[in-house]
Amino acid sequence: MISLFRYMREALMRGVQVVVGTALFDVWPLLSLRHAILRLYFQAGAGFLVGRHFQFHRPHFLRAPAGARLTFAQNVKINSNVEIDYSGGVEIADDVWISQNVIIETHEHVIGSGPKSGWLVKWFPLEIGRDAWIGANAIILPGVKRIGARAIVGAAAVVSREVLDGEIVGGVPARMIGQRPAEREGE
């Protein structure tokens, strides 16, 4: 019975996301309705904005950790065509920007000798720190535990390791290419 409930809830969440993610919801007052509906499903703070054609989902949700959630703090901005797999849980802090076409994955398949349907699935929680910016077309791979506060992930980067606070990374695989200047008091 619990599995049926989880299945129906996931199906409803995906269906609602498809509907509110269309261009129709890009006009006011429907844009406000999009954000209100998403707040019903996900913990989202004030200033939460999301573009069209997004997808927040939990593949293998029947086997995924029950406590895995997707949470958004204050002033999180998510552009169009973003896919966030929150099977392992994703926590997004204040003032984070996620640019268009970003893919965030929090699960992986452990390749075995038998049929694919029998392979194990591993989940990894992810935290995106305050004031981080994920550039367009970036991919965050499973196993990355944290994108640090004030970190910047460059466009088209493939992140396979933790990004430290204030670090600027880019490339495939992503590596440090710079450091954000220290925050000044009052900024």
Segments (PLM) and residue ranges:
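A short acidic, glycine-rich active-site loop
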Residues: K116-L126
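Left-handed beta-helix
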Residues: G51-R52, H57-R58, A68, A73-Q74, ...
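Short linear capping/connector segments at secondary-structure termini
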Residues: P59, G114-S117
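Conserved SAM-binding loop
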Residues: V82, I111-S113
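Metal-dependent phosphoesterase signature
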Residues: L62
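Terminal amphipathic alpha-helical/low-complexity segments used for targeting or macromolecular assembly
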Residues: M1-G47, D95, E108-V110, D131, ...
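Conserved catalytic-core motifs of eukaryotic protein kinase domains, centered on the activation segment
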Residues: P115-K116, V144, R180
